Amino acid sequence: MEIIKLREEFIKLGQALKAEGLVESGVEAKEVIQDGFVKVNGEVDTRRGKKLYDGDIVFFDGTEIKIEK
């Protein structure tokens, strides 16, 4: 499991995927999110701007990312 430490109150879903190097660009993040390949807390979420907070878990392409404060 990868961990993203929040510097602010939240991080957006597309930014989290880019920060972990799971996508190369914002355009790629938008595509994989809108196509339903990303889960947030166990459910598919198609909003690139979805705000992730402490305790949220993202799953994409075999990688799990935990958001921590």
Predicted regions located by residue number:
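Short, charged beta-turn/beta-strand-edge "cap" motif at the junction between a beta-strand
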Residues: 44, 62-67
